[in-house]
Amino acid sequence: MQHRDEILTPSQLNTLARDLLESAFPLVWIEGELGNVSRPSSGHLYVTLKDAQAQVRCAMFKPKSQWLTFQPREGLRVLARGRLTLYEARGDYQIVLDHLEESGEGALRRAFEQLRIRLEAEGLFDPARKQPLPVHPRRIAVITSPSGAVIRDILSVLMRRFPLVEIELLPSLVQGDTAAAQITHLLGGADSSGRYDAILIARGGGSLEDLWAFNNEQLARTIAAAHTPVISAIGHETDFTLADFAADIRAPTPSVAAELLVPDQRALRQHLGQLQQRLLHLQQHRLDQAIQRADQLGLRLQARNPEMHLRLLAQRQAEAGRRLQQCLHHVLDRAQGQLRNHHTRLYALNPRQQIAGLQKHLKHLNPQQPLQRRLQQEQLRLHGLVRALEAVNPLATVARGYALVRRADNNTLVRDSAQVCVGDVLDTKLAHGQLRVRVEISST
């Protein structure tokens, strides 16, 4: 007996039941007779599927029901596929249908599923085998009926989007006993010719029996083995054939297939305009870089130009000469200044000048001072100056028995025997007279 803590509400119970149903029956096929057919203004389809013993409610919502190729009616025997679920508000379980066909197609549907499973197990539908569509195809082969809305829609879209593409129609039956063989033959020939960048196989909508030519095993194998990319556009969006599984690309409609095959010329023009602008900017940038590089190389070349180098050396030489001249002038000015200073000092130390000054001073002596004493002082001072003058007079030294010796060639005063060599001629100044002698012996 269930514990009271586990008591459920009706909503909880219905939710649990719904989850169990959906997990146990994710997808079911059911065959029965239609009853209670209702199609309100919303576009949804509500029916009852029944047999002699039971019935089950079914719903097909507008996105699926609008593609039905027949008119559901009371008593019609159908084959349905859907997901089992529970309508929680009433506690009723129902099937949400995604496929509904007349019951005569049931055998075809089972044959289709068996063949699809077998080919899929062989790897015929492996995504790794798929080829990408060309970005800018030049020639496209279209295998379809030469009359009808399909080829008109395809040509209209292709010419509008990319009128430069070349389109070749390979007319074929798209329904009937011989259609599959004819489509297979045209596809094989188009692929082996190597003339086409892509091949489009297209047909309008129809029942499973109408589309049965595209569930042919040989056609599916030819599509999978093709070296040319193949795009299929067969029936409506809800219709799937073996040709769709084998093709490199499956389009929901022929018009969409045409859009997938070629680029939009308006987008291409816009892209080309953008590329042109980028190219112009890039060219201008490269040109600016080249000009800048040329300017730099010109400056470097100019800096290494021998003529420029010589001019630079000449400027440096002129500057060095100017600085040397300034330096010489400065040295001469300093020497002349020092010479003037020495001359002034020597002039001031000249005994004759001092005597003249003293004599001038004597004239201005105060007559009130004792003249005799003043005169004696000045005489003593005069005698001292005379002695000082005689002391520095070289002639006085000569008078005491010495001699002044000079080189005869340059009149240089000789103070050291190292200044002369044997054979040199010397002039000797004596107290009375002068001698010219030749050196025979020289010693230190």
Swiss-Prot record:
Family: Belongs to the XseA family.
Species per Swiss-Prot/TrEMBL record: Xylella fastidiosa (strain Temecula1 / ATCC 700964)
PANTHER family noted in UniProt: EXODEOXYRIBONUCLEASE 7 LARGE SUBUNIT (PTHR30008:SF0)
UniProtKB keywords: Cytoplasm, Exonuclease, Hydrolase, Nuclease
Matches recorded under Pfam families: Exonuc_VII_L, tRNA_anti_2
Record's subunit section: Heterooligomer composed of large and small subunits.
GO CC entries: cytoplasm; exodeoxyribonuclease VII complex
InterPro entries cross-referenced by the UniProt entry: Exonuc_VII_L, Exonuc_VII_lsu_C, OB-fold_nuc-bd_dom
EC code(s) of this entry: 3.1.11.6
Record has Metal-binding as a keyword: no
GO BP terms: DNA catabolic process
GO MF assignments: exodeoxyribonuclease VII activity; nucleic acid binding
Keyword Magnesium in annotation: no
Name recorded for this polypeptide: Exodeoxyribonuclease 7 large subunit
Function summary: Bidirectionally degrades single-stranded DNA into large acid-insoluble oligonucleotides, which are then degraded further into small acid-soluble oligonucleotides.
Main location: cytoplasm
Subcellular location(s) of the protein: Cytoplasm
Gene name of the record: xseA
Catalytic activity: Exonucleolytic cleavage in either 5'- to 3'- or 3'- to 5'-direction to yield nucleoside 5'-phosphates
